[in-house]
Design a protein with these regions (language model features):
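A local structural motif
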Residues: 75-84, 100, 178-192, 228-230, ...
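A bilobed periplasmic-binding-protein/Venus flytrap-type ligand-binding module shared by bacterial periplasmic
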Residues: 137-148, 240-254
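Bacterial lipoprotein signal-peptidase II cleavage site
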Residues: 21-33
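Bacterial Sec-type N-terminal signal peptides, specifically the leucine/valine-rich hydrophobic h-region
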Residues: 14-19
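Bilobed "Venus flytrap"/periplasmic-binding protein-like clamshell domains
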Residues: 50-74, 86, 109, 133-200, ...
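Beta->alpha turn/N-cap motifs
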Residues: 53-55, 85-89, 99-118, 126-127, ...
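An extracytoplasmic/periplasmic, membrane-proximal ligand-sensing/linker region
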Residues: 39-52, 57-64, 68, 240, ...
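Short beta-strand->loop
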Residues: 121-132, 187-188, 222-239
Length: 311
């Protein structure tokens, strides 16, 4: 079920996404009666399922949302699911490679390196209400009264970016700039540590422009902390397929199938809080994905000579 999110021209534009990954806040959701402690449960290796989440938003906000999803998943699998929002994008790849995670949600480019370095296998992703693979876009915004009209005007200016290696918060914006002849050294890039922080830097007048992707835009607008009418978007990327949820490669095939089936049969209501952070509102049931759905990201990483060191 390969999706054509990237036209040939869009692929060239998108040819510079960057990775995503993991970090540190852990929480165990759901300890169903009759889990692994009551006997052998092939769906419950080690007595719990460790589920890593990339830190694309404040962990204090992400954890409760993923706990809802994890609780529903734990009931279907009869096994507690432990949610861990990792500290940074590279940490999740390392955690899966070292066998510290059973499942991991990676950013699109992060999945490239999770696949190559940890053998992560994609299971599902987030679907729209019409049951299609959802997507999001990177963007660069300026204040409404800014004299900057296009990204070509950013030469010599300051730009707030998210985390190093972020698909939409780092690599895509820099690739867009490169496309108009602006090298990294031609402007001041401020890595703020995350998407919300980049938005805040623009809002507080600390930079001339900031990366704001459609997910962060939806979250901040919904929370009433950002008014888009006070700002302008001067650049946007091609659509990016949303994050895949992956499984460790050495998991038992029966476990992989059980987890995939459980995700696919989750009620959209159990996905809704996570979907809101991913700009998938309202969400549909989760949808099966394969490596083919993210092939443009693999092509991009190769074209840009990106490695896991770019995380």
């Amino acid at each position: 079920m390969k999706k054509s999110f990237f036209t040939s021209s869009a692929l060239a534009l998108v040819a510079a996404l960057a990775l995503s990954a993991c970090g540190g806040t852990a929480n165990s959701a759901g300890t169903p009666a009759g889990s692994a402690s009551s006997g052998i449960n092939a769906n419950c290796p080690g007595g719990e399922i460790k589920f890593g989440i990339e830190p694309y938003e404040d962990p204090a906000k992400l954890t409760p949302a993923y706990d809802v999803l994890a609780t529903a998943l734990s009931k279907k699998l009869n096994c507690p699911v432990k949610v861990q929002v990792v500290e940074d994008y590279s940490a999740e790849v390392l955690a899966m490679r070292n066998g510290k995670l059973d499942l991991g949600e990676f950013g699109p480019l992060g999945f490239v390196f999770a696949s190559q370095k940890a053998g992560a296998e994609p299971l599902v992703s987030f679907a729209t209400s019409d049951k299609k693979l959802s997507s999001y876009s990177a963007g660069i915004w300026v204040a409404k009264d800014s004299p900057l009209k296009t990204i070509a005007d950013l030469k010599g200016k300051s730009l707030a970016l998210g985390s190093v290696g972020s698909t939409s918060g780092d690599v895509l914006p820099r690739f867009g700039l490169r496309g108009v002849g602006i090298a990294d050294a031609d402007l001041k890039m401020d890595y703020t540590g995350g998407h919300p922080e980049a938005l805040l830097a623009l809002k507080n007048g600390k930079v001339d422009a900031a990366e704001i992707n459609t997910q962060t835009l939806a979250t901040a607008t919904g929370a009433g902390t950002f008014n888009p009418s006070d700002y302008r978007r001067i650049w946007t990327s091609a659509p990016i397929p949303n994050d895949p949820i992956t499984v460790r490669p050495d998991a038992d095939p029966a476990f992989k199938k059980a987890v995939k089936d459980a995700f696919l049969t989750l009620d959209p209501a159990d996905i809704a809080k996570v979907g809101a952070f991913l700009d998938v509102t309202p969400p549909g049931p989760m949808i099966a994905v394969s490596k083919d759905d993210y092939q443009p990201l693999f092509d991009l990483a190769k074209t840009m000579n990106l490695t896991e060191k770019n995380l």
